[in-house]
């Protein structure tokens, strides 16, 4: 099975979020790697990015979002639908199956909430993995 990766480089949009995970700040454009600033370690961050459906996929194609991060995100959504119910983890890579869940244009959302036991969220890189 052949694997192809499409890097989801910037720009990304970042929003600081409250305890309920809802945005409480204006949108700030950012690039990866993204680190939550020390001044906002008590809150969380919602990172969003749009991407187009890749060409040449069919019913046998497996699609995954892969995030390289210092910890597991609290939530991952594609087009508003949660996909983080069962992430596969290998080292610092978190893989989410999105087969059959994408449209012509898509919105990826990654939520990191603040924790008291860990350092701030760092999202190093992200990509769309195509297996088929």
Each predicted region: which residue ranges?
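Cysteine-clustered segments with highest specificity for TGF-beta superfamily mature ligands
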Residues: 105-116
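Extended carbohydrate-recognition surfaces in non-catalytic/accessory domains of CAZymes
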Residues: 1-63, 88, 116-128, 132
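Short, surface-exposed tryptophan/glycine-enriched loops
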Residues: 92-107
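Short hydrophobic beta-strand segments in globular cytosolic domains
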Residues: 82-85
């Amino acid at each position: 099975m052949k694997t192809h990766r499409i890097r989801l480089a910037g720009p990304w949009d970042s929003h600081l979020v409250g305890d309920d995970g809802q945005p409480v700040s204006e949108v700030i454009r950012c690039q990866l790697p993204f680190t939550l600033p020390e001044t906002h370690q008590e809150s969380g961050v919602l990172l969003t990015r749009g991407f187009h459906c890749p060409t040449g996929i069919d019913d046998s194609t497996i699609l995954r979002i892969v995030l390289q991060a210092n910890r597991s995100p609290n939530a991952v959504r594609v087009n508003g639908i949660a996909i983080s119910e069962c992430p596969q983890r290998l080292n610092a890579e978190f893989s989410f199956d999105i087969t059959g869940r994408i449209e012509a244009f898509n919105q990826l959302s990654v939520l990191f909430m603040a924790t008291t036991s860990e350092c701030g969220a760092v999202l190093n890189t992200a990509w769309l993995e195509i297996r088929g």
